[in-house]
Amino acid sequence: YNIGANVRNSLIASGCIINGDVENSIIFKKAYIGNNCVIKNSIILNDVYIGDNTVIENCIVESRDTIRANTKHIGEPGEIKIIIEKNERYVL
C-alpha cells in the first residue's frame, strides 16, 4: 500500500499497488488502483489497471481490464455489475 491508501475488511493479493480506498473487497494479483480511487464491495481480478479518481462499487472487474480515470461504475443493490473491456452487463 502506498502513502494515503486506506484498506478495510479486504483481501489483497501479492503484487498489487494500492493508492486509494478499498473496503469490503477482494483484489487479485498485480492490480493497480490509482490515486483517490474508491473501491467498495467489489472483486477486482488479475492484472487490472484502475485510473485515478475512479469509483467502483458492487462490481466485478474482469482480468486484464483497464478502467479509465475519472469514471464511476456502481452496481445496484441486489445486482452485480460485471465490467469487461469497456462493455458492461448486469447479472442477478
What does each of the following model-derived ranges do?
Residues Y1-L92:
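Left-handed beta-helix
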